[in-house]
């Protein structure tokens, strides 16, 4: 995840636009679930994955369209034959992908990526917060206890707290919210004092 956001920030610093593809929801049998991410760059190369196969291919192509239109959007894909949005797979699931356009001239987008990287370097609980209006993402920010809600004021901290879970959470409605864990604090237990264990211990 650090590599993905670092590469995005570098592209923006180099004056290049980039699209972040994020799975917001999945049901049935799908390659990856909510929270999977892939960055698509102007030359077509990608960092990260949302599951490979037809979903990733179609998403990469759609991301290149978003780079041209400069408009973020939400797109659903059906992984079952003979259905609307059928992409030729037979898994039987559904995937919703958010294509988020980042413009190198947008300081807010760059600040958001920098804030995400700061949280990824830490070891405290943190979340990505998305607000949905009319089925489209209208705002995105981060939340952690040390800094509170940043980069958006789309929801009050009091209303947000019940949605801060260890798994991705969707609150339907208009507005709706999608809350995704970014980092989760935890402990690692090392058993044994051999060469591997001693190398891992701080």
Regions flagged by a language model, labelled:
Residues 1-202:
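Segments forming oxygen-rich coordination pockets for charged ligands
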